[in-house]
Amino acid sequence: KFDSNGPRYTSYPTADRFVEAFNAEALRTWLAKRAVGGVSKPLSLYFHIPFCNTICYYCACNKIITKDHGRSAKYLKYLAKEIEMQAACLGGSRQVTQLHLGGGTPTFLSHDEMRELMAAVREHFTLVPNGEYSIEVDPRKVDFETVQLLAELGFNRMSVGVQDFAEDVQQAVNRVQSYDETKLVIDAARATGFKSVSMDLIYGLPKQNVISFNRTLEQVLAISPD
């Protein structure tokens, strides 16, 4: 069962659906089909923030490695236009029960940029009060004030990147992150009212072994993620 590769499913539509024949008109046709049977069905939205300060060697996501925050400002300008166009195509009721910010590193955005993005979302979509609003967080670039802002903007679920706490593994994959700074972010999330906090781990990384990964699991259990 687990001795062969499976599809890498991260979002819908999956990347292999975006072929040359899939043009703007095809997208509009897809979106128009939502009206069939009523437009009251709730939506799930995914926003991709591709920017990262440094590269993690294991990462296969669509990413842009840069320390130039001017690039994210330009990206948000076009993302706001895309939000407006998608909302117009969907028409009717645009109630959202799930929203997720992934990347890349969503917290690459400045506080003002994060406010700008969520204002654009709320201008064109209705986020229901009891929805699930999630964001991926890099503990190396987040402080209490950032977590507090995310809570104020309506986020209630946080996914914290860890992968492994073993220092030699972290060095091998170019992602050095201490247990303490990880715990600080998770404690901040709980203090500011996040309903759920998860932690991402990867097995099969360079330098890992059963003993070291078991130690990482024990540290994760000590934090007690949801």
Model-identified regions with their sequence ranges:
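Short glycine/proline-enriched loop/turn "hinge" motifs that connect secondary-structure elements
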Residues: 37-39, 48-51, 92, 191
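Structural motif
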Residues: 43-44, 98
